[in-house]
Amino acid sequence: MSSNTSRSCSTRSRQNSRVSSQVLVDAKLHGNFEESERLFDYSASINLNMPSSSCEIPSSAVSTYLQKIQRGMLIQPFGCLIVVDEKNLKVIAFSENTQEMLGLIPHTVPSMEQREALTIGTDVKSLFLSPGCSALEKAVDFGEISILNPITLHCRSSSKPFYAILHRIEEGLVIDLEPVSPDEVPVTAAGALRSYKLAAKSISRLQALPSGNMLLLCDALVKEVSELTGYDRVMVYKFHEDGHGEVIAECCREDMEPYLGLHYSATDIPQASRFLFMRNKVRMICDCSAVPVKVVQDKSLSQPISLSGSTLRAPHGCHAQYMSNMGSVASLVMSVTINGSDSDEMNRDLQTGRHLWGLVVCHHASPRFVPFPLRYACEFLTQVFGVQINKEAESAVLLKEKRILQTQSVLCDMLFRNAPIGIVTQSPNIMDLVKCDGAALYYRDNLWSLGVTPTETQIRDLIDWVLKSHGGNTGFTTESLMESGYPDASVLGESICGMAAVYISEKDFLFWFRSSTAKQIKWGGARHDPNDRDGKRMHPRSSFKAFMEIVRWKSVPWDDMEMDAINSLQLIIKGSLQEEHSKTVVDVPLVDNRVQKVDELCVIVNEMVRLIDTAAVPIFAVDASGVINGWNSKAAEVTGLAVEQAIGKPVSDLVEDDSVETVKNMLALALEGSEERGAEIRIRAFGPKRKSSPVELVVNTCCSRDMTNNVLGVCFIGQDVTGQKTLTENYSRVKGDYARIMWSPSTLIPPIFITNENGVCSEWNNAMQKLSGIKREEVVNKILLGEVFTTDDYGCCLKDHDTLTKLRIGFNAVISGQKNIEKLLFGFYHRDGSFIEALLSANKRTDIEGKVTGVLCFLQVPSPELQYALQVQQISEHAIACALNKLAYLRHEVKDPEKAISFLQDLLHSSGLSEDQKRLLRTSVLCREQLAKVISDSDIEGIEEGYVELDCSEFGLQESLEAVVKQVMELSIERKVQISCDYPQEVSSMRLYGDNLRLQQILSETLLSSIRFTPALRGLCVSFKVIARIEAIGKRMKRVELEFRIIHPAPGLPEDLVREMFQPLRKGTSREGLGLHITQKLVKLMERGTLRYLRESEMSAFVILTEFPLI
């Protein structure tokens, strides 16, 4: 078993034991609170110094505690909740405030015949208007449903908008409904990417910070979150290995007590809550004092509904009291997760392999609600912060490991000259190996000590105690001598709490000592006031006091890396002393500092040689005469020439003839002290690769120098670009337009995919299909980041969550116009399970007005330039831009005459017209407004996808019908076709609420098509008929279902035109087909809108059905 594996196993065992113990303590605290409520004595209950085994808590109590946390059946009152069965969308649970929030409670006393609008078994689609219901039905069939959040739903009774936030549980689909503020423009699932833009500037500032300073990064984050959300206090909590938390950054109002530096017990954030933070990255409490709302569920369900994933889940009473005690009413918490080992199962996401590093916590002194889009933006910002933290943590670990290895190497070198005394008498010494307050060597009844250590007598007592109580041949490690049972721990005091002791022979020991953690912790909020009443209440100050009492006799834990270093040094010393037992200790005088530095340098040089030999790029070195004296494994692999065969050969014999002069010039310049970068050379292939083409390398040179800084030779660090060169050269010969490049089956074409401005994939070429194993039809019209590239077991599965976050950052930057993505390295899994690494380049696509319309992406495998493809793409985009320029020109030129017509109509309106003249003027106004509406329609894709919002207002049906008929009169006269209007006075005189201009557009287009395809024979007639059915909604409201029938003689519309009307748009669609297709899509946007085309032997007809509220 490797050291890493053993380290992981030991950590996992230790962490799992800690988590299990902590859950028991959490359950006991919960039980105490439930029993005593407001008389709860926090300080007495948090006595965690007792072993967890002494907490005699039955398993049923723990189960009850966990169920209360996750299945409490209470929500916050700022929203309402509905749970539906996914199979039929029938309601199986709902919160008691749902009917009130959705406006379903009648204002008058209901009669016996009236049924309640919401009960168990109600079809949820009956509660909302049709566009939202369609989105809800689509969501049910969606895999990762959270990608679609939020869905905008409008109440059927009041048209009030809500954000629907969906997630799945075992029983069905949970719909959290949050009201949309009147001054807020609702976003849709397709617009979720836009909410990222709220945090775009904050993300840019965060990424621009210099690396190597984690506290600077945390300080920047709290300021950015504070500006985004407006909370009174924003903090970054970091969880330590023992589970306790620390406030490491804070931004708060000047009049508030600072919490920066506060340490609090692990029980302040229970393990169950940490588990929920891994599932739900954002948690908002609007008002901790608000009375929670109960959830009613179907009695046939076997257990209470799980609310663990709900954004509305009510805070537990214990947490609400804690918030109240510290003067906080509202909070917003975001989890920070990073990559980690599998050591902490409770705080680890089993799907992503990430664990909970800490939290970003916002507090406010008054109730505060943050809408979903802003919460989503904050979540994204926190994800970016997590990526940065992950980098900083990894860098810190590598730096620590490097420092330990360097110190260990020097200590080992000392052992060969002065074993073992040199490691405590020279510099560096064993105190430099790991962080400690003191260290000691007890060897052959003599003691050498450094820093803060026990006395020699106390050291001997410690040795006797370790041998007696913890016998073995390895040693003993503890962070608390007091808790480990050392009888004289109190005598040693808080200066010596933690100890690492290892055997180097039968009675010889190495010691490292650490003082109490409490000595290292300072919090500005800590104070000692006899009148302080926080001592027994749940409050940060009492929590800090409890924590300080817990760590009074504890040191910082010894981490696995430190123990690996200590155990490695132990083994080395044991080995060096095996032959020395019979010899006396000889204290060799200190060597000259220069000799010592040379020895240290030798150790480092040996390590560098190993790193060079195992590097993933070809590296070779030559002496001043050009003879090879270094040839690493990668160079041997790419050329086929073994190391022993390359050493001693002139470099000119190994390179192609056309590269000899280049190499000689580089060598000459290097010997003069000038180093080259990015030079291209070609090396011959040998052995099995002899028949292959030469190896193409892009190399940098660096000089090899001696102790006096004289140049001895040159080192060439190369990058193998043979594949890229071959692909680029072949590809430069490919001719053709953009479509041929996109869909050519040639392997020379790079993988290409395209998204629109909402992040939805619109293209996926053959090369991308082959590279990923996923067909085009499986990804087009799906969200690229989350549905195509995922961290789950479908689509192109990415390596980890960080990769997905980096891609989101990059795409957000491209779409917001900040910068393009240039050769971003990322990897994903092929459908067959193989892992693929590639370089991603992405460029924004814009329309004629400079607005970003999407992103063009192509992969380089392995990193070819493919300049020709980009040129072809630019030509194609230029052609499209020219066409859009013409269209924009026409739109612009029409606007001025349209404004003039509007001005003249306003003048006529105030000039004393007769009633007939006013009616004609009103008809012309409606026609002009309809024209302006059509001209402004630039988002055909939005109409196609059903994302266009209707512009609703009160209107008269008679006026709209007259405007429709007037639009078709000229064509009617031209083709000698009569129009028969059949709509009763009581129908035409109706006042309705809806989008009258869209209704005019629909009716005029279908009426024109009917006349256009009626034979031009005198006497033929097109019938325009309107049928109304009025339905009462409660006592006061009514709605009318309108049926428009446009009947025209056979043969009617051509079959091809009917197909174009109902089928998706495709290349080559006729103008008439486009008009009817858009009309059919607009009908679907109307309330319960449907359009059918009926064909009989003698007659054909358009039948249009829709509903309007009746004023």
Curated annotation (Swiss-Prot):
Q: Which keywords annotate this record?
A: Chromophore, Photoreceptor protein, Receptor, Repeat, Sensory transduction, Transcription, Transcription regulation
> Cross-referenced SUPFAM superfamilies, in alphabetical order?
ATPase domain of HSP90 chaperone/DNA topoisomerase II/histidine kinase, GAF domain-like, PYP-like sensor domain (PAS domain)
Residues recorded as binding phytochromobilin, renumbered to this chain, are C318
Bilayer-crossing regions: none
| Every GAF domain range | 213-393
Start and end of every Histidine kinase domain? 889-1111
Which Gene Ontology MF annotations are present? photoreceptor activity; protein homodimerization activity
BP terms from Gene Ontology: detection of visible light; red, far-red light phototransduction; regulation of DNA-templated transcription; response to blue light
Q: Where is the PAS domain?
A: 604-674, 737-808
**PTM:** Contains one covalently linked phytochromobilin chromophore.
The record's comment on protein family reads: Belongs to the phytochrome family.
Q: What's its job?
A: Regulatory photoreceptor which exists in two forms that are reversibly interconvertible by light: the Pr form that absorbs maximally in the red region of the spectrum and the Pfr form that absorbs maximally in the far-red region. Photoconversion of Pr to Pfr induces an array of morphogenic responses, whereas reconversion of Pfr to Pr cancels the induction of those responses. Pfr controls the expression of a number of nuclear genes including those encoding the small subunit of ribulose-bisphosphate carboxylase, chlorophyll A/B binding protein, protochlorophyllide reductase, rRNA, etc.
Subunit and interaction comment: Homodimer.
Name of the protein described by the UniProt record: Phytochrome C
Query: Which species does the entry assign this protein to?
Result: Arabidopsis thaliana (Mouse-ear cress)
The root-end lineage is: Eukaryota, Viridiplantae, Streptophyta, Embryophyta, Tracheophyta
